[in-house]
Swiss-Prot record:
Protein known as: Transcription factor HBP-1b(c38)
Gene3D superfamilies: 1.20.5.170
Keyword Nucleotide-binding: no
Family membership noted in the UniProt record: Belongs to the bZIP family.
Pfam families in alphabetical order: bZIP_1 (PF00170), DOG1 (PF14144)
Domain (DOG1): residue spans on this chain: 111-329
Molecular function GO terms recorded: DNA-binding transcription factor activity; sequence-specific DNA binding
Source species of the chain: Triticum aestivum (Wheat)
Cell compartment(s), UniProt: Nucleus
Record function comment: Transcriptional activator that binds specifically to the DNA sequence 5'-TGACG-3'. Recognizes ocs elements like the as-1 motif of the cauliflower mosaic virus 35S promoter. Binding to the as-1-like cis elements mediate auxin- and salicylic acid-inducible transcription. Binds to the hexamer motif 5'-ACGTCA-3' of histone gene promoters.
Protein keywords: Activator, Coiled coil, DNA-binding, Nucleus, Transcription, Transcription regulation
């Protein structure tokens, strides 16, 4: 019984030590619980931030979608306005009709038809010139020569008529001389030869000429030069006027607005009207060429007229030959 007491003491001491350690355990538990709550709180904050970011991203996405839809709507309205303006312009005769593609096709066919007709004309012209050359070399009489000369002059009238018809389909094709060889185009003036230059060439090739003939050719050359200058000045004025019309509203802001569309259509209508005078310029130039040939025939004798036609033909033939030689030259 005496030995039992120390064990009891020891047991009591252990109990006391355990009791003394219990506050520490409680503190550790408190710290652990606080840490858990802090982690939960931080996790909640991160979640809230992510939710806020998602809401902001969704809001911006909705705004972008709304702006895109509005842009599409504005574009649709602007397109509708343009279509209405174009429709009104067509009804008023300001704009080219909806058959523009068909007109372009007809224009292209007209140019092609003229090129074909010109090739046939040139073939027949060369045949007639060879006939005239043979008659001159054979010292044929004036009656025979006059018959061939008149035939060639009538043949020239035919090409002038064909050019006039072709110009109605495509005046640019005829005016630019696309139906000629490159070398011929270099010397082209308003879709053909320059009458004053032709007379200058003939005056040196038809000697001897009487004083009356020289005076007649000189006067014809001066009048032709004056007419050429007037037509050239008219073409320059037309080009300047066209440039001013087309450049009228370039660079203006809000090009899609209704007012600017109407202004654009009006300017195109003015430009189209001015381009319509090109056919008139070409017609006047061809009339001058035709009259020059006729006046030349009146001034010269039949034999001189025959020689003049041969000179004109030989000069044109040499230009065509020059084009062929140039195109066939060795390329380095």
């Amino acid at each position: 019984m005496a030995e039992a007491s120390p064990r009891t003491e020891t047991s009591t001491d252990d109990t006391d030590e355990n009791l003394m350690l219990e506050p520490g355990n409680a503190a550790l538990a408190v710290v652990s619980d606080s840490s858990d709550r802090s982690r939960d709180k931080n996790g909640d904050q991160k979640t809230m931030r992510r939710l806020a970011q998602n809401r902001e991203a969704a809001r911006k996405s909705r705004l972008r979608k709304k702006a895109y839809v509005q842009q599409l709507e504005n574009s649709r309205l602007k397109l509708t306005q343009l279509e209405q303006e174009l429709q009104r312009a067509r009804q008023q005769g300001i704009f080219i009709s909806s058959s523009a593609d068909q007109s372009h096709s007809m224009s292209g066919n007209g140019a092609l038809a003229f090129d074909t007709e010109y090739a046939r004309w040139l073939e027949e012209h060369n045949r007639q010139v060879n006939e005239l050359r043979a008659a001159v070399n054979a010292h044929a009489g004036d009656t025979e020569l006059r018959s061939v000369v008149e035939k060639i002059m009538s043949h020239y009238d035919e090409i002038f008529k064909q050019k006039g018809n072709a110009a109605k389909a495509d005046v640019f094709h005829v005016l630019s001389g696309m139906w000629k060889t490159p070398a011929e185009r270099c010397f082209l003036w308003l879709g053909g030869f320059r009458p004053s230059e032709l007379l200058k060439l003939l005056s040196t090739q038809l000697e001897p000429l009487t004083e009356q003939q020289l005076s007649g050719i000189c006067n014809l050359q001066q009048s032709s030069q004056q007419a050429e200058d007037a037509l050239s000045q008219g073409m320059e004025a037309l080009q300047q006027s066209l440039a001013e019309t087309l450049a009228g509203s370039i660079g203006s802001s809000g090009s899609g607005s209704t007012g600017n569309v109407a202004n654009y259509m009006g300017q195109m209508a003015m430009a189209m009207g001015k381009l319509g005078t090109l056919e008139n310029f070409l017609s006047q130039a061809d009339n001058l060429r035709q009259q020059t040939l006729q006046q030349m025939q009146r001034i010269l004798t039949t034999r001189q007229s025959a020689r003049a036609l041969l000179v004109i033909s030989d000069y044109s033939s040499r230009l065509r030959a020059l084009s062929s030689l140039w195109l066939a030259r060795p390329k380095e």
